[in-house]
């Protein structure tokens, strides 16, 4: 059997394995906690950021999203738009960092009470479990259980197109009740 045929057979056999392996999450370089510990800056109307939304399983770009703070009052509203200018559903926070309407899932989720988007304390020893209920717009009588365990993993140096930053790495473990009663043990 010649070399090119062996290579083809081997690569054909391994191709399905490569398709099933998810992409890894980006990791920064571990660093010591900054002194003094930074504060989370408060929101300001007009503040905006743009990011690339990717599918973590295949690396495909799902879109380029811009979020802009449009309202600060009893709630904080982040207007969202796609690269072509189309308006997307707004994210709503009850206070800065406490999400009530989350747009990051395949369907819009409304949480009551709201959930933190980042650790409540910027400390490497911090972790906490949150229990709430969520509903899907159009089905608000159906409130389902949501448990989230958030834990800090440490400080790291990350490099992004905007520059090099020191960031706090944290992890969420989510256990939720699915709106489809046939789907159980939903853990993310």
What is the predicted function of each stretch?
Residues 34-160, 164-167, 174-185:
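Conserved functional acidic sites
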Residues 7-26:
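N-terminal export signals
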Residues 23-36:
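Short, low-complexity, disordered segments immediately C-terminal to signal peptides
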